Amino acid sequence: MELREEAWSPGPLDSEDQQMASHENPVDILIMDDDDVPSWPPTKLSPPQSAPPAGPPPRPRPPAPYICNECGKSFSHWSKLTRHQRTHTGERPNACADCGKTFSQSSHLVQHRRIHTGEKPYACLECGKRFSWSSNLMQHQRIHTGEKPYTCPDCGRSFTQSKSLAKHRRSHSGLKPFVCPRCGRGFSQPKSLARHLRLHPELSGPGVAAKVLAASVRRAKGPEEAVAADGEIAIPVGDGEGIIVVGAPGEGAAAAAAMAGAGAKAAGPRSRRAPAPKPYVCLECGKGFGHGAGLLAHQRAQHGDGLGAAGGEEPAHICVECGEGFVQGAALRRHKKIHAVGAPSVCSSCGQSYYRAGGEEEDDDDEAAGGRCPECRGGEGR
């Protein structure tokens, strides 16, 4: 038998040999017996550790060293305390350059200025309609979503706005807070009182009607607000016959009647001098304006697209005298008679009020007709 010497070469390694060869130090290999092999699935599991909170920890509230002496409320900055104290002092240092209205905060002035500039930065994503205030946009979006968060507790009917619910609830209670100071008749809506005031010539003037409406709206909100707003307002009636006191503290609006024999001098100490006349009054909220354009801008911003707009239509016919808008031209022509002739006339036959079709040149014809309305005069020729 012949023996040969051959060079040894490593053969193919199995999986275990490859694992051992991969370690430089054989000591790193852990060899366990069958008894030491852990069972699967494990019998005991430790609870998972809670993940650390995402983001930075909440910042601590800053100290509030500035305290209001009136109510004890504290603030972190002196400027915030100064702004808060204006609610107690009534200071309004921010004035509008266009209408003179004052505000306690500059941000409120910025919002008010949008009435004059026409700026509408808030747009509806559904229809593209724009608004001057975010609150108006929120109310408008309920038209698309169908949301009606204000529900009547009496009948269950829902509304999109709180003021609509307040108007509706008067139908259940029968409350008529808007009272005519001349005859004591009550109305549930301020616009109904405005139409009724045309029957009283001494109350149909723009300036007088504005005071009556504003005082009636304030009195409907509460006696405290009525007294704090303007107190007593004395309105002359006729030529020295007497006055009507509107907004007298401690009295109901129905008790504010004509004071015969008081004279024109009695109106002096009772009247409170206003900074500027505001003959144009919003029939929805009672707010007064010095110009018709301001009233129209207010109504479009706060109460919709203007007076006379039915079903969301844009009023295309605007009165140049007061800024009131109408959808139809015929309604505008009827409205212009108020500015052309002033107070309405009362028919001597039927007692109904009516407006003459022309100005002073038709007074002779009206007197010749005996002060009768066109319906009564027209019936004579039939």
From Swiss-Prot:
Entries under InterPro entries matching the protein: Snail/Krueppel_Znf, Znf_C2H2_sf, Znf_C2H2_type
Stated name of the protein: Zinc finger protein 787
Gene name per UniProt: ZNF787
Keyword NAD: no
Family: Belongs to the krueppel C2H2-type zinc-finger protein family.
Organism (species): Homo sapiens (Human)
Matching Gene3D superfamilies: Classic Zinc Finger (3.30.160.60)
Cross-link Glycyl lysine isopeptide (Lys-Gly) (interchain with G-Cter in SUMO2): where in chain: K191, K211
Biological processes annotated in GO: regulation of transcription by RNA polymerase II
Lineage: Eukaryota, Metazoa, Chordata, Craniata, Vertebrata
